[in-house]
């Protein structure tokens, strides 16, 4: 058995409880990950309150992103037990149980292997934030090296990631913030 935060239906945040479920069993194309950390996203708040897509069903273990260590794989997997992986989206926490658990079963296609000595709490904040910033720059804006981009909210976590990614990709990045005291923050991250 393992600890999970499983929602039986819509609830307030103070009604969420730790409960027990069996450890999920590996199947072809999927792997079991020991979850070490996960980010908490606004979309999960909508799911918790019953405001998700009509396809979202209860009971459900939330969590659309996470980081951890591969615990078990199916025969023929390209992953190995003990590997560090990040994982996000692809139905995680919506169509099948997510990262608010000690172990989660994920399709291999959403796993991103990495190696890091950073602490798990830091790593756990990176996956979805990075995907959002990257997707905004590259897919939504179609920005490329040499372009100048404006990042509104340049002191938010996603904004700072967009600044860093944009600079690293060869863009000139201009960033805004509402707070005068925070003006140096995006500049320290590389904004012009």
What does each of the following model-derived ranges do?
Residues 18-23, 67-69, 84, 103-105, ...:
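Conserved hydrophobic/aromatic beta-strand scaffold that supports enzyme active sites
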Residues 87-153:
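NAD(P)H dinucleotide-binding glycine-rich loop of Rossmann-like/cofactor-binding domains
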Residues 1-5:
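Short structural boundary motif marking the start of a folded domain
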Residues 126-192:
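Mid-domain Rossmann-like dinucleotide-binding core that forms the NAD(H)/NADP(H) cofactor-binding site
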Residues 43-49:
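Cytochrome P450 core scaffold surrounding the K-helix E-X-X-R motif
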């Amino acid at each position: 058995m393992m600890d999970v935060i499983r929602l039986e239906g819509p609830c307030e945040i103070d009604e969420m409880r730790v409960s027990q479920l069996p450890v999920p069993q590996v199947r072809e194309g999927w792997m079991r990950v020991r979850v070490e950390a996960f980010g908490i996203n606004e979309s999960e708040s909508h799911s918790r309150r019953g405001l998700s897509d009509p396809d979202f069903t209860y009971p459900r273990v939330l969590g659309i992103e996470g980081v951890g260590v591969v615990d078990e794989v199916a025969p023929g997997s390209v992953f190995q037990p003990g590997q560090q992986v990040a994982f996000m989206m692809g139905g995680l926490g919506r169509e099948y149980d997510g990262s608010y658990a000690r172990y989660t079963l994920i399709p291999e296609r959403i796993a991103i292997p990495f190696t890091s000595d950073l602490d798990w709490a830091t790593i756990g904040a990176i996956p979805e934030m990075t995907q959002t910033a990257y997707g905004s720059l590259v897919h939504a804006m179609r920005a490329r090296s040499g372009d100048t981009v404006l990042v509104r909210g340049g002191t938010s976590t996603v904004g700072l990631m967009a600044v860093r990614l944009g600079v690293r990709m060869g863009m000139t990045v201009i960033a805004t913030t509402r707070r005068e005291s925070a003006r140096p923050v995006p500049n320290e991250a590389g904004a012009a």
